[in-house]
C-alpha cells in the first residue's frame, strides 16, 4: 500500500510503497486527520541564521531562479511554515543549489536547511546522532524511513501478531 508519512505525524509529504507480507489479513495504521507543519518541527530555527547552515550567495539565488523558471518549476524547494515539507531525499538535502531544501530568512536571504532541521522534518528526535561528514549525514537522513511512520507500522504489525491466528484449514474454508 502507498503510505504518505504526512498522514502519520511526520511534517513532510513522503509517499512510499510499504509491503507487509502476512498469512492472514493486515490492517495498516490509521491515518491522522491533522498534519504536522514545518513550523512545528523547525519553527525555532527557520527564521535565524543557524550555525552550520549555508547562506545562498546572490549568484546562487540568481542561478536557482533561472533554473526554476526554465524548468517551469511550480513547486520550488523553499519551506513554508504553514505546510508540510516536500519529500526530503539524500539528493535534495546535500545538493549545492537548485534542488536543495531552503528557508527564507527575514532579511530576504535564503539558506540551506541544516542536518538537524532535515532530521526533524523526518521525525528524528533531537538526541539522535548521525555519523560521518555532512554529505553522509544528509544521505542517512534522506534515505531513512521516518521514525514516526516506522513506529506506527511496527505497532500495526505487533497488533496483527497478537491477534489469534486461523489455521490453514480455517483460511481455506
Stretches found by the model and what they are:
Residues 48, 52-173:
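C-terminal target-recognition/interaction regions appended to catalytic cores
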Residues 1-81:
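Class I S-adenosyl-L-methionine
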Amino acid at each position: 500500500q502507498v503510505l504518505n508519512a504526512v498522514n502519520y505525524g511526520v511534517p513532510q509529504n513522503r509517499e512510499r510503497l510499504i509491503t507487509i507480507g502476512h498469512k492472514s489479513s493486515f490492517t495498516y495504521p490509521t491515518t491522522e486527520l491533522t498534519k504536522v507543519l514545518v513550523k512545528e518541527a523547525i519553527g525555532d530555527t527557520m527564521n535565524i541564521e543557524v550555525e552550520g547552515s549555508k547562506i545562498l550567495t546572490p549568484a546562487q539565488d540568481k542561478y536557482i531562479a533561472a533554473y526554476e523558471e526554465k524548468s517551469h518549476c511550480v513547486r520550488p524547494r523553499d519551506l513554508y511554515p504553514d505546510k508540510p515539507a516536500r519529500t526530503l531525499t539524500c539528493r535534495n538535502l546535500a545538493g549545492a543549489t537548485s534542488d536543495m531544501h531552503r528557508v527564507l530568512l527575514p532579511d530576504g536571504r535564503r539558506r540551506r536547511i541544516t542536518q538537524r532541521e532535515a532530521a526533524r522534518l523526518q521525525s528524528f528526535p533531537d538526541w539522535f546522532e548521525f555519523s560521518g561528514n555532512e554529505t553522509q549525514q544528509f544521505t542517512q537522513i534522506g534515505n531513512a524511513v521516518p521514525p514516526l511512520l516506522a513506529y506506527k507500522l511496527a505497532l500495526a504489525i505487533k497488533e496483527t501478531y497478537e491477534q489469534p491466528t486461523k489455521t490453514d484449514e480455517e483460511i481455506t474454508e
